[in-house]
Amino acid sequence: MKLAVVGATGLVGSEILEVLEEHQFPFDELLLVASERSAGKKMTFKGKEYTVIGLKQAVSEKPDVAIFSAGGGTSLEWAPQFAEVGTIVI
């Protein structure tokens, strides 16, 4: 399963990542997603370094599941775009 965490660089996104790690949530691929200004930032999850990607790129990656922890406006704009490509949006 390809999992996207939208808003990964924010406070809530960081907490979601902690919960995913604590509960050993199963996934094959992880996409850390944030605003375009945060794209390119490096983050570590479970000892592996990830590069944060922007929302547009994340939609094109067609994740199976996207967990949104971004602000309301961002979620209202982008959640439907993820759903349109078949992503389950949480």
What do the PLM-derived regions correspond to, one by one?
Residues 1-90:
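N-terminal Rossmann-like NAD(P) cofactor-binding subdomain of oxidoreductases
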